[in-house]
């Protein structure tokens, strides 16, 4: 079994303790900071705007794991300082410019992930498998922290891994997001 990586949700990190959290994350060799970008349109919440993310960049060198839960992700990705080796996920469900998003992220040197909601069939992603580094599977219905885990998503992740392996896509990573507490 492959070793997993942990990405801490900055949406859940209280601003009043941000330096404490970042110090703890650094000491624990945390691989990524999970940055949820929400526009209040694709999901019924607003989270982590450009100024907040710019400030985070100034105070930490931990790579970012962006998750764009927005309409028109191609436009909104350009608002952020996405760097080489950052992970960037955008949703399949509302995106008519998937190829353009993947090309944009490739030019930046970022790892491209396509995110899917609990009810979305992962087979829809097959046309993009040669162009992505990973698939982000939502294990909750997105929008707010603390939502209840959708139990069927655990099997979905297992089935997705088998599907990718069967296609010879063993290099494609699977990221899970939602109500994962350790």
Features from the language model and the residues they span:
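Short, flexible active-site-adjacent loop segments at beta-strand->alpha-helix junctions, enriched
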Residues: 72, 94, 116-120, 141, ...
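Short glycine/serine/threonine-biased micro-segments
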Residues: 38, 47, 141-144, 176
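Histidine/lysine/aspartate-rich catalytic loop segments that bind and position anionic ligands
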Residues: 116-153, 159
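Conserved N-terminal beta1-alpha1 strand-loop-helix module at the mouth
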Residues: 1-87, 95-97, 104-106, 112, ...
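Active-site/ligand-binding-proximal alpha/beta "capping" segment
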Residues: 141, 148-182
């Amino acid at each position: 079994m492959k070793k997993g990586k942990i990405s801490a949700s900055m949406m859940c990190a209280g601003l009043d303790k941000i330096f404490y959290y970042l110090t703890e994350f650094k000491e624990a060799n945390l691989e990524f900071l999970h940055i949820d970008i929400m526009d209040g349109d694709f999901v019924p919440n607003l989270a982590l705007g450009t100024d907040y993310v710019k400030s985070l960049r100034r105070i930490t060198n931990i790579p970012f794991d962006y998750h764009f839960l927005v309409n028109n992700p191609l436009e909104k990705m350009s608002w952020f300082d996405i760097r080489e080796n950052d992970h960037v996920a955008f949703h399949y469900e509302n995106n008519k410019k998937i190829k353009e998003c993947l090309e944009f992220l490739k030019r930046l040197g970022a790892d491209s992930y396509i995110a899917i909601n609990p009810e979305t069939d992962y087979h829809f992603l097959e046309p993009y498998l040669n162009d992505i580094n990973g698939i982000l599977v939502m294990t909750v219905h997105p929008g707010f922290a603390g939502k209840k885990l959708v139990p069927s998503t655990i099997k979905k992740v297992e089935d997705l891994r088998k599907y990718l392996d069967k296609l010879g896509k063993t290099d494609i990573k699977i990221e899970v997001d939602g109500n994962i507490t350790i």
